[in-house]
């Protein structure tokens, strides 16, 4: 497995694989890898000849400098895991490699509406940072396929629209959220939970599943469902942050034409912000 830190070497290796007719997959990450990331990698391994994983803690998508400073950097451990899973190349650039002129003078990629609604409303600039760095990685790697988890659902839809709008010749493969045996969505943030918080954390997905079951049975009073969910989260020990039920394709409010809904939940548990989502088929 190659570990590459610079753009020229990355391009050299990609050029070689292209000349050999290889099918290339890109899995963008910020490191601190867990089994959810490994599922992305394993899915890519089954569909491509070459798997490239980027590890870059993107400063552009952090709203608060202290969050950026606290984000775990575990490159050695990450590379060991990726080697065991048969990854061909890890691209782990420094900030200067991605933003050689600094972020103040960087050209941005902004996806209208999707970047400022829902979670984007409370994290101004976050999704612009995501779309900019992913666009840059796409330009550098020029993959045939790219892999994103469904856990960050708004991010997934944002990248999907960016690929369509900018005419990237890239197939986006979405991979279902990986959960532990209690139903808790795997996340790097779970490492920040105390023992008591770990015990409480699965309640988030249980409450979400309860909403999904009611909607699958025909319930459409979404505001009432969300009010009940907020009360249940409070009772369980969470501080609700953002609770939405939206059209899964557009993330707009549900309407009579919506075929699939997505329940989007974010809540604080102690000092950790937990997020989760679940899609619901509305056509049955």
From Swiss-Prot:
Listed GO biological process terms: pantothenate biosynthetic process
Classification via InterPro entries: Cyt_trans-like, Pantoate_ligase, Pantoate_ligase_C, Rossmann-like_a/b/a_fold
A molecular-function term among this protein's GO annotations: pantoate-beta-alanine ligase activity
Predominant localisation class: cytoplasm
GO CC aspect terms: cytosol
Keyword Cell cycle recorded: no
Catalytic machinery residues: 37 (proton donor)
Metabolic or biological pathway, per its Swiss-Prot or TrEMBL entry: Cofactor biosynthesis; (R)-pantothenate biosynthesis; (R)-pantothenate from (R)-pantoate and beta-alanine: step 1/1
Residues that hold (R)-pantoate according to the record: 61, 155
Domain of life according to the entry: Bacteria
Reaction(s) the record says it catalyses: (R)-pantoate + beta-alanine + ATP = (R)-pantothenate + AMP + diphosphate + H(+)
Residues binding beta-alanine, per UniProt: 61
Record's subcellular location: Cytoplasm
Keyword field: ATP-binding, Cytoplasm, Ligase, Nucleotide-binding, Pantothenate biosynthesis
Binding site residues for ATP: 30-37, 149-152, 178, 186-189
E.C. numbers: 6.3.2.1
Family annotation (HAMAP family): PanC (MF_00158)
Function: Catalyzes the condensation of pantoate with beta-alanine in an ATP-dependent reaction via a pantoyl-adenylate intermediate.
Subunit structure: Homodimer.
Additional remarks: The reaction proceeds by a bi uni uni bi ping pong mechanism.
Protein family (similarity comment): Belongs to the pantothenate synthetase family.
Name used for this protein in its record: Pantothenate synthetase
Species per Swiss-Prot/TrEMBL record: Photorhabdus laumondii subsp. laumondii (strain DSM 15139 / CIP 105565 / TT01)
Gene: panC
């Amino acid at each position: 497995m190659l570990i590459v830190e610079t753009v020229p070497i990355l391009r050299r290796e990609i050029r070689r694989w292209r000349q050999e007719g290889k099918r290339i997959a890109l899995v963008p990450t910020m490191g601190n890898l867990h089994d959810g990331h490994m599922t992305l990698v394993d899915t890519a391994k089954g569909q491509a000849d070459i798997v490239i994983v980027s590890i870059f803690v993107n400063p552009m998508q952090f709203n608060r400098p202290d969050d950026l400073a606290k984000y775990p950097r575990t490159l050695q451990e990450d590379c060991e895991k990726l080697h065991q899973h048969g990854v061909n190349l890890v691209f782990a650039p420094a900030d200067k490699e991605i933003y050689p002129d600094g972020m103040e003078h960087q050209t941005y990629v902004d996806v209208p509406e999707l970047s400022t609604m829902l979670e984007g409303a409370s994290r101004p600039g976050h999704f612009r940072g995501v779309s900019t760095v992913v666009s840059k990685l796409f330009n550098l790697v020029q993959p045939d396929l790219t892999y994103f988890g469904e856990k960050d659902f708004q991010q997934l839809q944002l990248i999907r629209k960016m690929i369509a709008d900018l005419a990237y010749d890239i197939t986006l493969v979405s991979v279902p959220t990986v959960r532990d045996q209690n139903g808790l969505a795997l996340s790097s943030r779970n490492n920040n939970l105390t023992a008591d918080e770990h015990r409480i954390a699965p309640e988030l997905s249980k409450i979400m599943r309860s909403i999904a079951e009611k909607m699958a049975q025909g319930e459409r009073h979404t505001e009432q469902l969300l009010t009940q969910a907020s009360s249940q989260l409070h009772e369980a020990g969470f501080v609700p942050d953002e609770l939405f039920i939206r059209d899964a394709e557009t993330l707009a409010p549900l309407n009579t034409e919506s075929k699939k809904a997505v329940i989007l939940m974010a809540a604080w548990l102690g000092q950790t912000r937990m997020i989760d989502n679940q899609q619901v088929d509305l056509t049955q």
